[in-house]
Design a protein with these regions (language model features):
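C-terminal alpha-helical cap of glycosyltransferases
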Residues: 149-173
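Acidic donor-binding loop of glycosyltransferase active sites
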Residues: 69-79
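Acidic, glycine-centered active-site loop in nucleotide-sugar glycosyltransferases
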Residues: 89-91, 105-115
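A short alpha->beta transition loop at the rim of the catalytic pocket in nucleotide-sugar-dependent
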Residues: 71-72, 90-92
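A short, well-ordered alpha-helix in the C-terminal region of glycosyltransferases
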Residues: 138-151
Length: 173
């Protein structure tokens, strides 16, 4: 399953990307598109899904952990929360269409350390997805790079995002 995430308010040509992915993926593959709060993208994708049985559009969900666990590959924006979740779950990723600033720095970091492939267009994204899905070695290297982040750091970042707090290290006696 290819999990496509458009960010909470959408990003770029998600419908075009999803439809082109469906045409290029093996017939036993399917695409789940998380539209977040973007009702326009959700409605448009739902219209297509009536005729395309391998397309599953989803609105806002608080169960991203389940989608990440089921995904063979994630395609999405390099937002801070998404990047953290991808690294925590160890899912191969293609990060695209970054917003200048924080997202572009996330993209640079994840691509520099081999934790994701970065793309700037639908065409590049389709090519990157094809390369990743056809190479188990490439996916494994990416997941290994994601796991190389110290887990204490990932846990602290996750706690900060979810709870607004960071656990303090235990005092040494």
């Amino acid at each position: 399953m290819v999990l496509v995430m458009s960010g909470s308010i959408g990003c770029g040509p998600m419908t075009t990307l999803a439809l082109k992915l469906l045409r290029r993926l093996p017939k036993d593959s399917f695409v789940v598109v998380i539209c977040g709060k973007n009702k326009g993208d959700l409605k448009e994708l739902q219209r297509y899904a009536k005729f395309l049985e391998r397309l599953y559009p989803v609105g806002f969900t608080d169960r991203m952990d389940l989608y990440y666990s089921a995904a063979d590959l994630v395609v999405g924006k390099p937002g801070g929360l998404s990047c953290t979740e991808i690294a925590q779950k160890g899912v191969p990723a293609v990060l695209m269409l970054s917003v200048p600033g924080c997202e572009s720095r996330n993209l640079e970091f994840f691509t520099r350390y081999g934790m994701a492939l970065g793309t700037e267009s639908v065409r590049d994204t389709l090519s990157a997805v094809r390369r990743l899905l056809s190479s188990a070695a490439m996916r494994n290297r990416m997941m290994l790079a994601q796991r190389s982040i110290p887990q204490g750091a990932v846990a602290a970042i996750t706690d900060l995002i979810e709870k607004g707090t960071v656990p303090l290290p235990a005092k040494e006696e």
